[in-house]
Amino acid sequence: MKRVGAHVSTAGGVENAPLQATSIGAKAFALFTKNQRQWKAPKLTTSSIEAFKKNCEAGGFRPEHILPHDSYLINLGSPDPEKLQRAREAFIEEMQRAEELGLLLLNFHPGSHLKEIAEERCLELIAESINRALDATKTVTAVIENTAGQGTNLGNRFEQLAFLVDRIEDKTRVGVCLDTCHLFASGYDLQTTAAIESTFMEFDRIVGLRYLRGMHLNDAMQPLGSRIDRHAGIGKGTIGMDAFRWIMNNPACEEIPLILETPDSAAWSEEISLLYALEQ
């Protein structure tokens, strides 16, 4: 089964996320387990954790279909030793929060070199940061998201993702989340069936489809290779419907969270229905 959902709000507590997901007809969802623009957060309460698990069960959401995202402040490849240490501690806390909620995945952007260190050195720091977090936790898989290549962000090329995966000591706890808008912005063509097929074959050859643990389904506002991360509604951007039709009929995309991060949250229910209508 295809598990389409959206990145839903946790207003009022994390336990409300599965309720939000159910209300839009989702079969998967993403969330922040804390405020994504702050370093510190109150600890999750026992009642909140129990209510989250109960609501997930009631909505039919299994842990492998839920894709929490870490804080936007975390740069696991920071060239500044103090900031790197802070990022590493925060990332471990994010993993621990996911574990407390009984979740199995944590989605994150790799990191940025900020024009202060070489790309390869930054990638080495990111890999080391991931290994430390996996050592400090037990069950959560680190799910690396490809980026649009904006500014000094790394992770926009499959070769960079492969560099990271290759250096993770526990291969059973590393995965990749492919964002369609980021792929397109990075120069990977998705506009036709042949184009997306070619892109996925390249991903399989360089990284490995076995590492695909989730996707973000977003159309793009900007042209191919723009390196600008601007999401558009499904079928309303420069990617078009062929890519989403291919994803909805591809066995590699079965039973992984397929998460909308499109701009209009009021349209998510409609977009979920639209995507399911593409199944053949």
Swiss-Prot record:
Leading EC class: hydrolase
Catalytic activity: Endonucleolytic cleavage to 5'-phosphooligonucleotide end-products
Binding residue positions for Zn(2+) 3: 182, 229, 231
Keywords noted in UniProt: DNA damage, DNA repair, Endonuclease, Hydrolase, Metal-binding, Nuclease, Zinc
A biological process from GO: base-excision repair
GO molecular-function terms, A-Z: deoxyribonuclease IV (phage-T4-induced) activity; DNA binding; DNA-(apurinic or apyrimidinic site) endonuclease activity; phosphoric diester hydrolase activity; zinc ion binding
InterPro entries xref list: AP_endonuc_2, AP_endonuc_F2_Zn_BS, Xyl_isomerase-like_sf, Xyl_isomerase-like_TIM-brl
Keyword Cytoplasm among record annotations: no
Keyword Hydrolase among UniProt keywords: yes
E.C. numbers: 3.1.21.2
CDD domains noted in UniProt: AP2Ec
Residues binding Zn(2+) 2: 145, 179, 216, 261
Record-annotated disulphide pairs: none
Cofactor(s) needed: Zn(2+)
Cofactor details (free text): Binds 3 Zn(2+) ions.
Binding-site list for Zn(2+) 1: 69, 109, 145
Family of this protein: Belongs to the AP endonuclease 2 family.
Functional summary from the UniProt entry: Endonuclease IV plays a role in DNA repair. It cleaves phosphodiester bonds at apurinic or apyrimidinic (AP) sites, generating a 3'-hydroxyl group and a 5'-terminal sugar phosphate.
Name by which UniProt lists this protein: Probable endonuclease 4
Annotated organism of origin: Pelodictyon phaeoclathratiforme (strain DSM 5477 / BU-1)
